[in-house]
């Protein structure tokens, strides 16, 4: 074994020019391949940090949203099938103040069953306190920011004010969620705060995410779905009206992320691109290695004259490939570390989340595939050289096997270039597509104005850099399941509902095809899709 290793080192040093090309080619290919397949594995691992995550299901109506009281009704009506259930609502990013320190944190509304349902570890506090509307639960990472060098327990009882207006007391600290989740939050606001505002009733406000933990999903889900119509009769008098859709279904939380067609397409593209790059790298190595066949044939014949068998030659060339691969891996690690910030920005994931012990099999699999493809083919070719080649000049007779390799090389490069052109065209289209409104020179901020809306408008319009001002409840591009609308003849449709001021439409340069802008609380604007679905 040591003799094989010695011969391999000598060969690598003797042909260092060619080997440098091999190492550079393989390093770049492994670098891109590992990142692509690690991103794919990350996308497929969403919510696997939840204990017994296969028991967690999301409630769907038209989308993954439902009525506010739904989870509580599930716990009450199906105690044998439902182990626990929680309801939550995304609040986006909110501003909190710890004294004079400004904190911008992702926030959700949730009930006291959030932690027990998802299996999130509650480090400090009691979940039951989430029934109080004046409390907050925060993540460990946020607690680290505000504990000021003291223990985590010291944050309990501290007050965070929402926009310097509404003080709320910290009553619990929970463990940080993994990055592989669509629902990110560092602050939990009690759902009772919304209930006190008369939000989230039956038959309206379909904007809540209900997550159910079933005891035995295989048999419980079908039984529960069959009994839901009877349950709804207790809470909604018109639930049996056939013209009003109240269809409920449950889908695994583990599939919630990949249910998005955009995510599935991204996974497919990264997988195909990764496979193409690895094949190109492996066969590029094979072609470079085999191009030295005529030159190395005599030395292989000498080895065989000295007693080396075909297996010995095969192992020697596998060792050579392994050494080149090892050096390439070291350089790949150096590249990843050197361009850490760039990689994290492009992938949108921290490297500590992308490369974990649970996903270590991904880069190892990539390396194994490259090693087998790049090592086995040239090793078998070199091992088949007869011992008689030591006595005469080696002339390669069969070259037909090179053509498939060259075809794969050119086909792979053509595919990658074509793929990049398609991506460029899509990017150009996305950046220049007519959105139906004009976002240029528009900035936004979130603030509860209430009766001060006119004062706020006067303040902004008096600023010399402000041309127009408008107000709305949410950003114009936000999309979620919304309200139920009665469109006549006993029919209902569901759609997003947005409160806006009369200055919003002209500011965003939204074109009104028919009618006029809203001027009173009893008027509304609808888009063409709403008209189509309503059948008007």
Regions found by a protein language model. Give the residues of each.
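Intracellular coupling helices
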Residues: 5-17, 281-324, 384-394
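Membrane-helix entry/capping segments
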Residues: 1-5, 9-20, 50, 227-276, ...
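Alpha-helical transmembrane segments of integral membrane proteins
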Residues: 21-32, 267-287, 320-332, 362-367, ...
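Membrane-proximal extracellular/periplasmic loop immediately following the first transmembrane helix
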Residues: 36-95, 102, 106-108, 203-213, ...
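Short, strongly hydrophobic transmembrane alpha-helices
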Residues: 7, 11-45, 402-426, 437
């Amino acid at each position: 074994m040591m003799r094989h290793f010695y011969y391999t080192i000598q060969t690598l040093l003797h042909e260092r020019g060619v080997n440098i090309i091999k190492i550079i080619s393989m390093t770049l290919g492994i670098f891109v391949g590992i990142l692509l397949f690690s991103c794919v594995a990350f996308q497929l691992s969403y919510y696997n940090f939840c204990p017994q995550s296969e028991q967690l299901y999301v409630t769907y109506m038209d989308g993954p949203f439902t009525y506010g009281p739904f989870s509580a009704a599930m716990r009450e009506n199906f105690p044998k099938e439902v182990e626990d259930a929680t309801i939550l609502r995304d609040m986006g990013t909110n501003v909190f103040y710890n004294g004079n320190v400004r904190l911008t944190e992702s926030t959700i509304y949730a009930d006291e069953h959030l932690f027990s349902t998802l299996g999130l570890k509650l480090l400090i506090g009691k979940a039951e306190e989430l029934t109080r509307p004046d409390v907050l639960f925060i993540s460990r990472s946020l607690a680290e920011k505000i504990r000021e060098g003291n223990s985590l327990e010291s944050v309990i009882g501290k007050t965070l004010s929402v926009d310097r207006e509404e003080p709320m007391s910290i009553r619990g600290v929970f463990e940080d969620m993994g990055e592989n989740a669509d629902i990110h939050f560092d602050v939990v606001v009690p759902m009772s705060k919304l209930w006190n505002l008369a939000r989230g009733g039956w038959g309206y406000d379909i904007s809540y995410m209900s997550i159910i933990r079933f005891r035995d999903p295989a048999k419980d889900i079908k039984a529960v779905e069959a009994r839901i119509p009877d349950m709804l009769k207790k809470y909604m008098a018109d639930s049996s009206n056939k013209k009003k859709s109240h269809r409920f279904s449950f889908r695994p939380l583990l599939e919630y992320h990949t249910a998005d067609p955009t995510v599935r397409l991204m996974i497919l593209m990264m997988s195909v691109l990764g496979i193409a790059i690895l094949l190109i790298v492996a066969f590029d190595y094979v072609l470079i290695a085999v191009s030295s066949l005529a030159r190395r044939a005599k030395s292989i014949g000498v080895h065989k004259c000295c007693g080396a068998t075909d297996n010995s030659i095969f192992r020697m060339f596998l060792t050579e490939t392994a050494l080149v691969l090892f050096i390439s891996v070291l350089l790949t690690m150096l590249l990843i570390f050197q361009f850490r910030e760039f990689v994290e920005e492009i992938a949108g994931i921290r490297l500590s989340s992308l490369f974990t012990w649970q996903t270590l099999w991904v880069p190892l699999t990539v390396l194994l595939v490259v090693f087998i493809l790049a090592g086995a083919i040239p090793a078998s070719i070199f091992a088949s050289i007869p011992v008689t080649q030591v006595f005469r000049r080696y002339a390669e007779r069969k070259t037909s096997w090179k053509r498939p390799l060259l075809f794969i090389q050119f086909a792979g490069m053509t595919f990658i270039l074509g793929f990049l052109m398609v991506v460029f065209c899509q990017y150009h289209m996305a950046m220049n597509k007519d959105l139906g409104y004009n976002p240029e020179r528009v900035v936004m901020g979130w603030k509860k104005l209430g009766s001060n809306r006119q004062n706020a408008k006067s303040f902004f319009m008096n600023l010399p850099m402000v041309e127009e001002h408008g107000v709305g409840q949410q950003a114009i591009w936000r999309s979620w399941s919304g309200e139920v609308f009665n469109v006549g003849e006993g029919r209902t449709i569901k759609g997003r509902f947005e409160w806006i001021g009369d200055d919003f439409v002209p500011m965003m340069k939204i074109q009104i095809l028919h009618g006029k802008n809203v001027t009173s609380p009893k008027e509304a604007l609808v888009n063409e899709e709403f008209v189509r679905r309503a059948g008007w």
